[in-house]
Amino acid sequence: MSLTADEYKQQGNAAFTAKDYDKAIELFTKAIEVSETPNHVLYSNRSACYTSLKKFSDALNDANECVKINPSWSKGYNRLGAAHLGLGDLDEAESNYKKALELDASNKAAKEGLDQVHRTQQARQAQPDLGLTQLFADPNLIENLKKNPKTSEMMKDPQLVAKLIGYKQNPQAIGQDLFTDPRLMTIMATLMGVDLNMDDINQSNSMPKEPETSKSTEQKKDAEPQSDSTTSKENSSKAPQKEESKESEPMEVDEDDSKIEADKEKAEGNKFYKARQFDEAIEHYNKAWELHKDITYLNNRAAAEYEKGEYETAISTLNDAVEQGREMRADYKVISKSFARIGNAYHKLGDLKKTIEYYQKSLTEHRTADILTKLRNAEKELKKAEAEAYVNPEKAEEARLEGKEYFTKSDWPNAVKAYTEMIKRAPEDARGYSNRAAALAKLMSFPEAIADCNKAIEKDPNFVRAYIRKATAQIAVKEYASALETLDAARTKDAEVNNGSSAREIDQLYYKASQQRFQPGTSNETPEETYQRAMKDPEVAAIMQDPVMQSILQQAQQNPAALQEHMKNPEVFKKIQTLIAAGIIRTGR
């Protein structure tokens, strides 16, 4: 079954990356043949392969075809510039690199290519005889050639030695002899430090460097200038051979090619993901990652693994995404998303500590409201889980008895600690809160005692002792009206649950609260002073401002017997009693 142009192109990209340029040319040729429409990128890629093989004429033909198909694509002119540079046509190379920069000022390869053209032009101007004068002016020339294993046998020919000595006077003469005596080519290469077995002689017209990610250690070594002990080589080191350190031409396998292809695979993966066909989605995300190293594809793959319930696999994928992202200096927002998804996976696994750890890492990279909310919820879950794991009724009873012992000894601080332990061990037992409230009250911590009583009442609304302790604390902080309300509730609950067994204690507290509520500041207080003091009480002020009560009080002034009739109403009775306690209504003495 024949492959598509895109499939051939992907295989060609892989072959190019592996430095198998002949194979890459074959695959790009097939891609060109099956492509429904002329594709400038395919010609550009094949041109890059030819350039890497130093087949500059073929590279030039493909580059011309590339710009013919798409004359507005700046990288096509990179290809033309590279081919012309390889052929030694510096003017055309310069012209095409400049054209590339006109179309795209950020074209890095064009800038590097143009710089190389300028360096080569300067070298030619500095040494119009290509450095031959310096090469043959070396007084140790013959001796060095005799010592070199590549040329030692040649130096046994006296006629050849005589020729070399003659070139000292006339170095241009070698141009005629090169075509008739191939030994001279070897000698020239040796003097210039060129290994004819390794590189084509045209390598001096080389291409811009390939991206670091596509270089191997061996290629870097091969690209370095060859070392030699001969003085003649040192003298010629300033010649254009310096440019031989350049490597093969980069191909368009990044944003304009591999990224586009990878995004297509990602889009296909997204379709399968939405259809909940996660295995197929993962397959496409893997292809996207193979085509272009963007950790977004790994994040997507992890999302599919997560939906499959393969949480540990997803965590492994996301850790790889973070590691790769660090190396590639990926956007911190993308890395933040990787950390967040690791947190999600750990949450599914029930590891709340790891969940919190990775949500925090995510927020360190990039703070978002969503992850912050998840972090807060996870922290609450962990706190709740730890509290639930701590529950132990037997330990709670031990703590209660310990607290009781401390309370009996008047060791209030340790009593509070013991009852706190009881609450942790049995958070639903109202007695722990009520007992701690009693100890806190002894320490004069009345607001905290009231809070504990409220918690005890919340846990057990029929716990009369909690109401009584709450009212006692409220009286201590002079919240008399609130204390009376609490005691009313206590009286009701006591009657319902305990048959009024605590009625006497409740009545005593009620009387105490009522008396202290409106207790005069001095024994010689005038009625006006009593009225002003009483009106500071919110309940008294509300009663006096009630239109119904105002009417009743006016009637009572004219007919005291009418007041007795109104007091048959429980609500009115309560309000009248409050006004009597406040000193607003004075009874006979």
Curated annotation (Swiss-Prot):
UniProt cross-references to InterPro entries, sorted A to Z: STI1/HOP_DP (IPR041243), STI1_HS-bd (IPR006636), TPR-like_helical_dom_sf (IPR011990), TPR_rpt (IPR019734)
Entry keywords, A to Z: Cytoplasm, Glycoprotein, Isopeptide bond, Phosphoprotein, Repeat, Stress response, TPR repeat, Ubl conjugation
Domain of life: Eukaryota
Start and stop residues of the TPR repeats: 5-38, 40-73, 74-107, 262-295, 297-328, 336-369, 396-429, 430-463, 465-492
Residues annotated as domain STI1: 138-177, 537-576
Example of a GO MF term: Hsp70 protein binding
UniProt feature, compositional bias: Polar residues: 226-239
Positions of region (Disordered): 199-265
Gene Ontology CC entries for this record: cytoplasm
Covalent cross-link Glycyl lysine isopeptide (Lys-Gly) (interchain with G-Cter in ubiquitin) as placed by the record, residue numbers: K99, K168, K384
Induction record: By heat shock and canavanine.
Cystine connections: none
Biological process annotations from GO: protein folding; protein localization; protein targeting to mitochondrion
Modified residues (Phosphoserine): S227
Compartments reported by the entry: Cytoplasm
Quaternary context: Part of a larger complex that includes HSP70, HSP90, and immunophilins.
Job description of the protein: May play a role in mediating the heat shock response of some HSP70 genes. It is required for optimal growth of yeast cells at both low and high temperature.
Protein name, as recorded: Heat shock protein STI1
